[in-house]
């Protein structure tokens, strides 16, 4: 069994009871942290099998709007399909690039600025890559964004929402975090996907910066901005790794 399949099967054991949203292996320890366990966990955002690039993050964070969005039936259903990696033919696997959810706070962080714009959150980390991909392959911005949504995935070390991650000691104890690290080690060893670690690199287990064809690890001093601009090692590496967009991509 591949590491990707093992990770997906691990999360297939999660059951949505609608009250406490936690993987059964994490149930006791997760309650000790400052996690918002009424929200669905988000260990992976994107299609892990098809992704050509995987971006490592610490945890999904917490926004005041998250609660309202999870009451949106269409969005919650998309979250659950993503959690089980059972994406539909019309899904945008990296959900924050889905035009239907372009007012989600995650969309402003990863994709394009929302209206009204919120400066601290509207970092649009993948926007430069989308625009460069559209120019490189001669397709529309919409087609390029759809391609990135299928070929880039975000892997969280901790799958649970938290504003501050006050109990970082739990990152070395939660079974789901250990599974994420196990997956990371397999991805790095195989080199089949580009892995980009921009933030919390020490928590992921990296001792310092790395720059190879299949692994980019930022210096810890770059962790605050965690830029994926084309001038950054991570952004330029992702663009190089991405396959060409089909001309008729929607």
Language model regions located:
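Short, flexible loop segments at boundaries between secondary-structure elements
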Residues: 212-248
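A polyanion-binding, active-site-adjacent surface
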Residues: 2-190
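Feature targets compositionally biased, intrinsically disordered low-complexity regions
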Residues: 45, 107, 207, 222, ...
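C-terminal end-of-chain micro-motif
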Residues: 1, 249-250
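C-terminal/domain-terminus segments
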Residues: 35, 174-179, 205-227
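Glycine-rich anion-binding loop/nest that anchors nucleotide
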Residues: 55-59, 192-204
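Residues at the C-termini of beta-strands that transition into short coil/loop
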Residues: 156-158, 199, 218-223
């Amino acid at each position: 069994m591949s590491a990707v399949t093992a990770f997906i099967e691990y999360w297939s054991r999660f059951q949505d009871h609608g009250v406490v949203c936690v993987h059964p292996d994490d149930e006791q320890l997760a309650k000790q942290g400052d996690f918002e366990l009424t929200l669905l966990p988000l260990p992976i955002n994107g299609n892990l099998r098809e992704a050509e690039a995987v971006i490592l993050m610490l945890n999904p964070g917490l926004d005041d709007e998250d609660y309202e969005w999870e009451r949106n039936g269409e969005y919650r259903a998309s979250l659950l399909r993503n959690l089980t990696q059972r994406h539909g033919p019309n899904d945008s696997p990296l959900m924050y690039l889905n035009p239907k959810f372009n007012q989600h706070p995650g969309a402003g962080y990863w994709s394009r600025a929302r209206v009204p714009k919120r400066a601290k959150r509207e970092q649009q980390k993948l926007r430069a890559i989308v625009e460069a991909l559209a120019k490189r392959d001669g397709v529309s911005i919409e087609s390029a964004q759809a391609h990135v949504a299928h070929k880039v995935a975000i892997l969280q070390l901790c799958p649970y929402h938290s504003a501050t991650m006050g109990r970082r000691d739990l990152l070395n104890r939660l079974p789901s975090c250990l599974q994420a690290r196990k997956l990371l080690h397999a991805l790095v060893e195989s080199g089949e996907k580009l892995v980009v670690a921009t933030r919390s690199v020490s928590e992921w287990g990296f001792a310092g910066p790395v720059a190879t064809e299949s692994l980019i690890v930022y210096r810890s001093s770059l962790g605050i901005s965690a830029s994926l601009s084309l001038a950054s090692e991570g952004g330029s590496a992702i663009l190089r790794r991405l396959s060409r967009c089909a001309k008729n991509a929607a």
